[in-house]
């Protein structure tokens, strides 16, 4: 369960195809991935719904994990989004209607073609070949937008799994990730380091996109691993943070980051939280360009390490900072120091929590049979 570490004082100072870039910079997604994102029907016979309604949950995620930019991510326990999906005769067959959005934000569009959950739901329905049933969807946001915790991926994952469940679980996790990528391509780019762990749980390595090749990395269950998540009151839009990425990198930095990403994978498989933290904290390519855009981030990382964290970096595109430790009690102390640094140096109020790894991923919470 999550533990609130410390809260700083109040009053501080689908089917949308992104346009391809004829000359993509080093860190841009290759346009061929984007133009081939549209999903295809995978089920020969249209399945009938086995439930009248379902409720699903998908967890928050930490993408990049330092040197694993766009190809490593993990799910964290206790934070995420819920989707309630119903068979609705008033909705046109083969379509989805978003009835309600509640939670941390209500400013999201209820147009399913402009909503992460809606796009993923439509993509999943297309994969299943659903043409004779209409669905209505309620989205409860447990994650704020632009937090660096995979908010869009959580919505997409919960929606994709909800559609799959209501029609009898005909699709596998890799196929659901593809459906979720339809949504991610619209919001933040065609990369799976949030949506894959949101659906599959645990750590996930994205080895390839054409074809999609996902490698679950299992952290040993008998080893302790905790994430200290500190989210400041500051929005870091993914598109803005991606625009800050360098277009060229020195070969020595490429070699360094590659070795640290390999060390991080080894640390996960061995259950070595210390090495995991060191590798996570070692990025020389992405973090140095993004940290200056988040007030106080460099001081927050320093405070985390001085307080005993094994490592600290930016979660996803930020602004959330993530530190790694092997004890919940130590994590609470580290979180307090990180919050203080955000306040003193960045003049930002923030909230810290200590979370375990979520090894389950998106799942069914409850259902009503026909």
UniProtKB/Swiss-Prot annotation:
Effect of substituting residue 180 to D: In dmr1-5; loss of function
EC assignment: 2.7.1.39
Effect of residue 46 to K: In dmr1-2; loss of function
Top-level taxonomic group: Eukaryota
Gene3D superfamilies referenced in this protein's UniProt entry, alphabetically: 3.30.230.10, GHMP kinase, C-terminal domain (3.30.70.890)
Pathway(s) per entry: Amino-acid biosynthesis; L-threonine biosynthesis; L-threonine from L-aspartate: step 4/5
Keywords: Amino-acid biosynthesis, ATP-binding, Chloroplast, Kinase, Nucleotide-binding, Plant defense, Plastid, Threonine biosynthesis, Transferase, Transit peptide
Catalytic activity: L-homoserine + ATP = O-phospho-L-homoserine + ADP + H(+)
Transmembrane segment boundaries: none
SUPFAM superfamilies noted in UniProt: GHMP Kinase, C-terminal domain, Ribosomal protein S5 domain 2-like
One annotated Gene Ontology cellular component of this protein: chloroplast
Phenotype on disruption: No visible phenotype under normal growth conditions, but mutant plant accumulate homoserine and show reduced susceptibility to the downy mildew pathogen Hyaloperonospora parasitica.
One of the protein's GO biological processes: threonine biosynthetic process
Enzyme class: transferase
Transit peptide: 1-34
Outcome (variant: residue 267 to V): In dmr1-1; loss of function
Xref: InterPro entries: GHMP_kinase_C_dom, GHMP_kinase_C_sf, GHMP_kinase_N_dom, GHMP_knse_ATP-bd_CS, Homoserine_kinase, Ribosomal_Su5_D2-typ_SF, Ribsml_uS5_D2-typ_fold_subgr
Function text: Catalyzes the ATP-dependent phosphorylation of L-homoserine to L-homoserine phosphate. Is specific for L-homoserine and cannot use other substrates such D-serine, L-serine, D-threonine and L-threonine, galactose or D-homoserine in vitro. Required for susceptibility to the downy mildew pathogen Hyaloperonospora parasitica.
Family: Belongs to the GHMP kinase family. Homoserine kinase subfamily.
Protein name per UniProt: Homoserine kinase
Organism this protein belongs to: Arabidopsis thaliana
Lineage: Eukaryota, Viridiplantae, Streptophyta, Embryophyta, Tracheophyta
